[in-house]
């Protein structure tokens, strides 16, 4: 029968794929995979979110940096001084250099208008 052989081959193939994936996970976690970005045997350190971006030494100055690597603070002070809320500055790779935090305003209490009486000459008869 050919079916047990096929399922055994499929199981072996699946096992090899899972082993390969596990090996790659361990290499990524250990930082062993070389991306070929430099001629040295060292892997460039991964860029973590929230850290300032600096160009690696093998790139010329200004190459490889996003245009918003240094968030513009010139818009931060006037904006934060003219609004009801406040802003949290952040290093963002998406162009938004600060997050607005607006206060939660309670609704105004409804005031009841005093009952008006109509004049007798206007009231319906």
From Swiss-Prot:
Q: Where is the composition biased (Polar residues)?
A: 67-77
Q: Which family does it belong to?
A: Belongs to the SOSS-C family.
UniProt record, GO biological process: DNA repair
**Residues annotated as transmembrane:** none
- In Swiss-Prot or TrEMBL terms, this protein is called SOSS complex subunit C homolog
Task: Provide GO CC annotations from the record.
Answer: nucleoplasm; SOSS complex
Give the matching InterPro entries.
SOSSC
User: Pfam families given for it?
Assistant: SOSSC
Signal peptide positions on this chain = none
- Region annotation (Disordered) maps to 43-77
